[in-house]
Amino acid sequence: MDLVRAHVFISGRVQGVSFRAYTRDRAREAQVKGWVRNLSDGRVEAVFEGTRPAVQKLISWCYSGPSQAQVERVEVHWEEPTGKEGIFTIVW
């Protein structure tokens, strides 16, 4: 099955609400590779690489996030998959 890669930026109240941990857990369950991190401007940034259905499901989840989050915007940039991402991790 073909791989896809999405570079995603999530805005709103998305830091301090376990967004990264929930994203990591959901990505691992879906066997999606990549990473997630907080940005200094208050957004969360993530790279998802996996099958199209799995990546699209993760992106859809980002629109709501964990129950404590208040997502205002999700920006998705589709990129060429690299095949080099490992197990999904939180980048510090």
UniProtKB/Swiss-Prot annotation:
Residue ranges annotated for the Acylphosphatase-like domain, each copy included: 5-92
EC id: 3.6.1.7
Active-site residues, as the UniProt record annotates them: 20, 38
GO molecular function: acylphosphatase activity
Catalytic activity: an acyl phosphate + H2O = a carboxylate + phosphate + H(+)
Protein family according to the UniProt entry: Belongs to the acylphosphatase family.
Name used for this protein in its record: Acylphosphatase
